[in-house]
Amino acid sequence: MRDIIFDNFQNSVNDSLLRHRNILDILSKYQESQARASRAVCKAVTNCGCIKVSAEKQDLIYDENYLENLNTITSGIEGQLCDNCREVIERELGNNMFYLASLCNALGLNLYDIYLKEYL
Protein backbone atom coordinates (compact mmCIF):
# COMPACT_ATOMS: atom_id res chain seq x y z
CA MET A 1 0.00 0.00 0.00
CA ARG A 2 2.80 2.42 0.86
CA ASP A 3 4.46 1.84 -2.48
CA ILE A 4 1.23 2.91 -4.17
CA ILE A 5 1.14 6.13 -2.15
CA PHE A 6 4.75 6.93 -3.06
CA ASP A 7 4.20 6.05 -6.71
CA ASN A 8 0.98 8.06 -6.91
CA PHE A 9 2.72 11.06 -5.38
CA GLN A 10 5.68 10.76 -7.74
CA ASN A 11 3.37 10.38 -10.74
CA SER A 12 1.22 13.35 -9.74
CA VAL A 13 4.37 15.49 -9.39
CA ASN A 14 5.41 14.45 -12.88
CA ASP A 15 1.96 15.27 -14.26
CA SER A 16 1.68 18.65 -12.53
CA LEU A 17 5.17 19.95 -13.23
CA LEU A 18 4.72 22.16 -16.26
CA ARG A 19 7.81 24.30 -15.89
CA HIS A 20 11.19 23.60 -14.35
CA ARG A 21 11.69 20.21 -16.04
CA ASN A 22 15.33 21.00 -16.72
CA ILE A 23 17.64 19.29 -14.22
CA LEU A 24 19.31 22.59 -13.30
CA ASP A 25 15.93 24.20 -12.64
CA ILE A 26 14.88 21.22 -10.53
CA LEU A 27 18.10 21.28 -8.51
CA SER A 28 17.82 25.01 -7.83
CA LYS A 29 14.13 24.75 -6.88
CA TYR A 30 14.90 21.77 -4.62
CA GLN A 31 17.67 23.70 -2.88
CA GLU A 32 15.43 26.77 -2.56
CA SER A 33 12.64 24.68 -1.03
CA GLN A 34 15.09 23.23 1.50
CA ALA A 35 16.22 26.72 2.45
CA ARG A 36 12.59 27.80 2.88
CA ALA A 37 11.90 24.83 5.14
CA SER A 38 14.96 25.62 7.25
CA ARG A 39 13.93 29.27 7.39
CA ALA A 40 10.44 28.31 8.59
CA VAL A 41 11.97 26.38 11.49
CA CYS A 42 14.20 29.35 12.33
CA LYS A 43 11.16 31.66 12.26
CA ALA A 44 9.37 29.37 14.72
CA VAL A 45 12.27 29.99 17.10
CA THR A 46 13.09 33.65 16.46
CA ASN A 47 9.76 35.24 15.49
CA CYS A 48 7.11 33.12 17.15
CA GLY A 49 9.04 31.59 20.00
CA CYS A 50 6.86 28.49 20.21
CA ILE A 51 10.02 26.39 20.18
CA LYS A 52 13.45 27.07 21.59
CA VAL A 53 16.82 25.67 20.57
CA SER A 54 18.90 24.53 23.50
CA ALA A 55 21.73 22.50 22.03
CA GLU A 56 25.01 21.45 23.54
CA LYS A 57 27.65 18.81 23.04
CA GLN A 58 26.27 15.35 23.67
CA ASP A 59 28.67 12.62 24.62
CA LEU A 60 27.74 9.20 23.34
CA ILE A 61 29.51 6.40 25.12
CA TYR A 62 30.06 3.30 23.02
CA ASP A 63 29.89 0.53 25.59
CA GLU A 64 27.59 -2.35 26.52
CA ASN A 65 24.86 0.19 27.41
CA TYR A 66 24.99 1.78 23.96
CA LEU A 67 21.26 1.38 23.27
CA GLU A 68 20.36 2.81 26.67
CA ASN A 69 22.72 5.72 26.08
CA LEU A 70 20.83 6.60 22.89
CA ASN A 71 17.86 7.55 25.07
CA THR A 72 19.89 10.38 26.60
CA ILE A 73 20.45 12.07 23.23
CA THR A 74 18.08 15.01 22.76
CA SER A 75 16.96 16.96 19.71
CA GLY A 76 17.91 20.28 21.26
CA ILE A 77 14.34 21.51 20.75
CA GLU A 78 12.26 22.68 23.68
CA GLY A 79 8.54 23.36 23.40
CA GLN A 80 5.97 22.46 20.77
CA LEU A 81 5.19 24.02 17.42
CA CYS A 82 2.11 26.23 17.49
CA ASP A 83 -0.58 25.52 14.89
CA ASN A 84 0.55 28.35 12.62
CA CYS A 85 4.23 27.37 12.62
CA ARG A 86 3.34 23.71 12.17
CA GLU A 87 1.22 24.60 9.13
CA VAL A 88 3.98 26.72 7.57
CA ILE A 89 6.67 24.09 8.15
CA GLU A 90 4.45 21.30 6.83
CA ARG A 91 3.75 23.36 3.70
CA GLU A 92 7.45 24.07 3.14
CA LEU A 93 8.43 20.43 3.73
CA GLY A 94 5.68 19.33 1.34
CA ASN A 95 7.08 21.69 -1.28
CA ASN A 96 10.53 20.21 -0.63
CA MET A 97 9.14 16.70 -1.10
CA PHE A 98 7.56 17.85 -4.37
CA TYR A 99 10.94 18.88 -5.77
CA LEU A 100 12.61 15.74 -4.39
CA ALA A 101 10.08 13.67 -6.34
CA SER A 102 10.68 15.87 -9.38
CA LEU A 103 14.42 15.25 -9.09
CA CYS A 104 13.78 11.50 -8.88
CA ASN A 105 11.59 11.70 -11.98
CA ALA A 106 14.23 13.59 -13.94
CA LEU A 107 16.86 11.00 -13.03
CA GLY A 108 14.59 7.99 -13.59
CA LEU A 109 14.65 7.02 -9.92
CA ASN A 110 11.82 5.61 -7.86
CA LEU A 111 11.30 7.42 -4.56
CA TYR A 112 9.87 4.36 -2.81
CA ASP A 113 12.82 2.20 -3.87
CA ILE A 114 15.20 4.80 -2.43
CA TYR A 115 13.19 4.86 0.79
CA LEU A 116 13.41 1.07 1.07
CA LYS A 117 17.16 1.04 0.47
CA GLU A 118 17.67 3.70 3.13
CA TYR A 119 15.26 2.17 5.62
CA LEU A 120 16.30 -1.45 5.27
PLM segments and residue spans:
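Flexible "arm" and connector segments at domain edges
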Residues: 1-93, 97-120
